[in-house]
Amino acid sequence: MQFGELVKTLAAVESTTQRTTMVKLLTSLFKKARPEEIDKIIYFVLGDLRPPWEGVELGVAEKLCLRAVSKATGVSISELEALYKKTGDVGEAARKALSTAKRPGLLAFGQQKPLEVSEVYDTLLKVAQASGEGAQDMKISLLASLFAKASPEEAKYIARFVVGKLRLGVADMTLIEALSDAFGVDKEALERAYHIYPDLGKLARHVAEGRPLEEIKITPGVPVLPMLAQRLSSSSEILAKLGGSAICEYKYDGERAQIHLKEGVVKIFSRRLEDITHAYPDVVKAVREAVSAREAILEGEIVAIDPDTGDMLPFQELMHRKRKHEVAVAVEMYPVVLNLFDLLYIDGEDLTNEPLIYRRVRLSEVVQETEKVSIAKWRVFDDAEEIDVFFHEAVSLGMEGLVCKSPTSVYEMGARGWNWIKYKRDYKSEMIDTVDLVVVGAFYGRGKRAGLYGAFLLAAYDPATDMFYTVCKVGSGFTDADLKKMYEMLQPYKIPHRHPRVVSKMEPDVWFTPQVVIEVIGAEITLSPLHTCCLGAVKPGVGLAIRFPRFTGRYRTDKSPEQATTVSEMIELYKRQKKVAQPE
């Protein structure tokens, strides 16, 4: 496929505000693609070269990209920087530079065969792989060769891609729907395969080649989509939901981790499927010592502890582990422990379809607890009062609460169902719990907030429609440093119109691709005609909103937008709140 064909589709996707139109455009694109290039097309649409856990990064900042454009066009760096400053878009700067190049003889566009998708992808992969002495010059030369062959519109999307600002915001579920339509594959079967092996490029090539999805198996080294939990704040309701019996375990305030062991090699993946092994060399060593298996996939929570007292510390302390050049120091200053709670695979045996109680037994058989690795504390209950006692014990020890699970439940990858239920209480607020919401818009600040965003439009996610519905406008709880950080975090996702996956009655000053997730709390959840979350579910014409919302200070960088609080969770919180508020 010619790269120009892909670019036409990207431009059309970027300009639409309708998700159905987006799906049709992508379906048409996939039908035209050859099997050997469809994986590359998928990666390009997603803004990545490889799946997230492979950690392939281009390592190209705006200045380096502009140097490559300058080399290809003869337009000076100062002129390009002025264009970039004026447009705020490195892609637009590249497009305009190629449209008005001072030395068009440098450009090969129109003088040879058009760029192919595979040529662009393979060149960008070489850019990502360039390392060591002279790597920067190599990256510039490779990119310049692409810009020299590209049309102005092609250059726009190449530039955006290499600096990580493609701005399309196409969700994995949208791509799955388009692949299903393009190749006549059952959508639910494709979703199941994606949950097991969440590499859409590989799956797209698999179906394009006409191979059966049954060949896709759980594989050590490839993270599966994590199973997620609903939430309730009553032990009796939890027991009723779980059929009268529950496995209750401590809910630790840490980082959820999927641990893969294969032939002595340990990999650690985040809930966003990113490889975070580099941050936890001590956990890698501890897993090798504690787990007796050749191959295994386990789940647990990595928790920071006080090196002097051994007491558990808040999740935020783990942020010290994220600075790659300071990990060795952080290991000493911010030690961690791993609390395991599930076993998904062991030596060729897929356990995800086995009941939880069986998986727990197998977990205890393969894990030898040590100072650094333990099995999360758990018990089986059939009495609500006993659950409450266990809950208060957990909270008194610094836990967030409990996670209560059906003993007979299988591991539902990627699902947020009622087989796992969080039992949490926030005693500092009238709201039962905090919520994790996605920033979809912003309002310009005034006074001392001038030049930044003063408030943000937040939304909850609906997995049934793959859309985001607004819940509140929040401006409280942000320090000056927070507002500056939010501005910087959101700039790469700024778009000229409402995103096709966002449903909103409010019109903010700025729209964003749904990407950034933050934690919010408020006084209560109320009915509101201004917001679209659960619109019409409680009362015709009105949705749910958070009254007096406040940012807690916690950036949920560990969560993807699709892992944010769902609309069903919002309505459950609203119902629970009403039950508490109304005397019996």
Curated annotation (Swiss-Prot):
Cofactor: Mg(2+)
Entry keyword set: ATP-binding, Cell cycle, Cell division, DNA damage, DNA recombination, DNA repair, DNA replication, Ligase, Magnesium, Metal-binding, Nucleotide-binding
Physiological role: DNA ligase that seals nicks in double-stranded DNA during DNA replication, DNA recombination and DNA repair.
Listed name of the protein: DNA ligase
Alphabetical list of PROSITE patterns matching this protein: DNA_LIGASE_A1, DNA_LIGASE_A3
InterPro entries: ATP-dep_DNA_ligase (IPR050191), DNA_ligae_ATP-dep_bac/arc (IPR022865), DNA_ligase_ATP-dep (IPR000977), DNA_ligase_ATP-dep_C (IPR012309), DNA_ligase_ATP-dep_cent (IPR012310), DNA_ligase_ATP-dep_CS (IPR016059), DNA_ligase_ATP-dep_N (IPR012308), DNA_ligase_N_sf (IPR036599)
Top-level taxon: Archaea
Active site, renumbered: 251 (n6-amp-lysine intermediate)
Enzyme Commission identifier(s): 6.5.1.1
Keyword NADP included in the entry's annotation: no
